[in-house]
Amino acid sequence: MGKGDPKKPRGKMSSYAFFVQTCREEHKKKHPDASVNFSEFSKKCSERWKTMSSKEKGKFEDMAKADKLRYEKEMKNYVPPKGETKKKFKDPNAPKRPPSAFFLFCSEFRPKIKGEHPGLSIGDVAKKLGEMWNNTAADDKQPYEKKAAKLKEKYEKDIAAYRAKGKVDAGKKVVAKAEKSKKKKEEEEDEDEDEEDEEDEEEEEEEEEDDDDDE
């Protein structure tokens, strides 16, 4: 199911993801009470997958094809909630949010997992990373947490400066708008004065003509 919308169809799985799922289920049946060493288990699955013949992999490839059809069919009937397609405007110059300790950990280990499990789907890679993080000792997490804290501190300073600059720019726009409005008003007043002067001149000329006629 989708993270934001519970009605969103579940993402399609790869043939390798189905294979790993089967291995996990087999392991649980054989060792229901045993805790799984995720790293070792993943390595064994990867090695086993590499040695399998095309015929053995065929079963999982068929499962992946069927799941792909299921996903495509569900997506055709899926209507996203209103407003989901609309994206908020993001200023490209705004400071980017800092990554979390877990995100930094993922950035480091994601290429390794992809290398060990080339057929793994994005969702399963994320799941593996989550399990690895949960099994990581607090001391081993510290370097990532320290780096994340430093990046957060820098971000807070940058965003404060960015917002302050935004207020200054907004203030400049207001002043510029006011000056423009004032200038326009002055120009209109000057035009009115010119029209009044022209009217006065016309009246004077008419009076002079009347005087000439009287003579």
From Swiss-Prot:
Gene field: HMGB1
Entry comment, domain topic: The acidic C-terminal domain forms a flexible structure which can reversibly interact intramolecularily with the HMG boxes and modulate binding to DNA and other proteins; may involve Lys-3 and histone H3 'Lys-37' and 'Lys-38'.
This protein's name: High mobility group protein B1
Organism for this UniProt entry: Gallus gallus (Chicken)
Gene Ontology MF terms in the entry: bubble DNA binding; DNA binding, bending; four-way junction DNA binding; non-sequence-specific DNA binding, bending; supercoiled DNA binding
Region span, Disordered: 75-95, 166-215
Record region (NLS 1): 27-43
UniProt PTM comment: Reduction/oxidation of cysteine residues Cys-23, Cys-45 and Cys-106 and a possible intramolecular disulfide bond involving Cys-23 and Cys-45 give rise to different redox forms with specific functional activities: 1- fully reduced HMGB1 (HMGB1C23hC45hC106h), 2- disulfide HMGB1 (HMGB1C23-C45C106h) and 3- sulfonyl HMGB1 (HMGB1C23soC45soC106so).
Location of the region described as Involved in interaction with histone H3 in the Swiss-Prot/TrEMBL record: 211-215
Biased segments, Acidic residues type: 187-215
UniProt keyword Ligase present: no
Disulfide bonds: C23-C45
SMART domains, per database record: HMG
